[in-house]
């Protein structure tokens, strides 16, 4: 059963990863996000540093996510979604509105992607071990395949740039829990094809805590 679900997840992951290359061009209006200028992006992202840190590591892990090493395409898409109202957050919706050009957003996104990839502090807790199993094997009885299929080994991502499946290994636990709960409740609706919402709805509160605990330590 685990093998069947994992194989299905791998096939779906490859399909959506291929789709993401085309989607990135559409999201950016035909512009190649990866060609942004990280040096210019550092200056343009000054306001971002107050929450996400100069190095892309959150100044308050209970509130703000890490951006260090995150895919530029994913950052670009999320900021656009905040601008368009497809994703809601009081702070980010306001901040996103201050980025007035796609070129500036591209430079900012590439700046954060250029940083050393986010890294957490490993924990040997029973909860983290449960989360590791969910991440790798999924929850077969609930029809949930392993997160590794789309998010890569240890949650560090798959592909050179990916606008759909973010780096989540080393992300803050509070942010991961909130996003999974928001997807589960329907508060967040900008995931591709509703895929993550469907998964989150099948996870128990404890399973959400477990997978977030594991990923926060990667």
Where are these regions (language model features)?
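Bacterial N-terminal signal peptides that target proteins for export
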Residues: 1-9
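Bacterial N-terminal signal peptides
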Residues: 9-18
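Sec/Tat signal peptide C-region and signal peptidase I cleavage site
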Residues: 19-23
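Electrostatic cytochrome c docking/interface patches
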Residues: 24-45, 58-61, 114-141
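The feature marks the first
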Residues: 28-84
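The canonical Cys-X-X-Cys-His
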Residues: 41, 48-54, 108, 144-153, ...
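Detector for the c-type heme attachment site
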Residues: 50-57, 113-114, 150-156, 216-217
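Axial heme c-ligation environment in periplasmic c-type cytochrome domains
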Residues: 59-66, 81-123, 160-167, 184-218
């Amino acid at each position: 059963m685990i093998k069947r679900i994992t194989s299905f997840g791998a096939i779906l992951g490859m399909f959506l990863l291929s789709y993401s290359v085309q989607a990135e061009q559409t999201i950016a209006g035909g512009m190649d996000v990866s060609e942004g200028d990280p040096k210019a992006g550092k200056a343009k992202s000054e306001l971002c540093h107050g929450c996400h840190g100069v190095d892309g590591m959150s100044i308050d892990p209970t509130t703000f996510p890490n951006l260090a090493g995150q895919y530029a395409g994913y950052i670009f898409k999320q900021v656009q979604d905040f601008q368009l109202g497809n994703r809601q957050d009081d702070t980010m919706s306001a901040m996103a509105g201050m980025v007035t050009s796609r070129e500036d957003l591209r430079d900012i996104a590439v700046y954060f992607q250029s940083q050393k990839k986010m890294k957490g502090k490993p924990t040997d807790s029973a909860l983290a071990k449960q989360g590791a199993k969910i991440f790798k094997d999924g929850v077969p009885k609930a029809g949930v395949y392993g997160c590794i299929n789309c998010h890569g080994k240890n949650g560090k991502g798959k592909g050179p740039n990916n606008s759909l499946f973010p780096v989540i290994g080393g992300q803050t636990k509070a942010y991961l829990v909130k996003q999974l709960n928001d997807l589960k409740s329907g508060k967040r609706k900008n995931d591709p094809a509703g895929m993550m919402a469907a998964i989150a709805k099948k996870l128990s509160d404890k399973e959400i805590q477990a997978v977030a605990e594991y990923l926060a330590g990667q």
